[in-house]
Amino acid sequence: MKTFTLIAILTCAVFVIFHAAAAEELEAQDVIETEALATLDEERLFECSFSCDIKKNGKPCKGSGEKKCSGGWRCKMNFCVKV
């Protein structure tokens, strides 16, 4: 009976250790993905600002000195789009 109890306790301990390790790994992956998304968003903002500086159909997408598109223009997929 003592052997069975010892085996059960050791099995539970191993299960808890593996579960904790898996949880840490998933948490680490979540943090990495979040950082990657933040970087991607910053890159998109930069690309959007850059593309809106380009003139489309002879008209600027945004006024000089403005940080956002105006005059009915919006940045979509790195292009100036008339709304």
Curated annotation (Swiss-Prot):
Domain of life according to the entry: Eukaryota
Tissue distribution: Expressed by the venom gland.
Pro-peptide positions on chain: 24-44
An example Gene Ontology CC term for this record: extracellular region
Molecular function GO labels: ion channel regulator activity; toxin activity
Compartments, record wording: Secreted
Pfam families: Toxin_20
Disulfide bond sites: C48-C61, C52-C75, C69-C80
Keywords: Disulfide bond, Ion channel impairing toxin, Knottin, Secreted, Signal, Toxin
Residues in the signal sequence: 1-23
Function field: Probable ion channel inhibitor.
Family designation: Belongs to the neurotoxin 12 (Hwtx-2) family. 03 (juruin) subfamily.
Protein name: U3-theraphotoxin-Cg1a
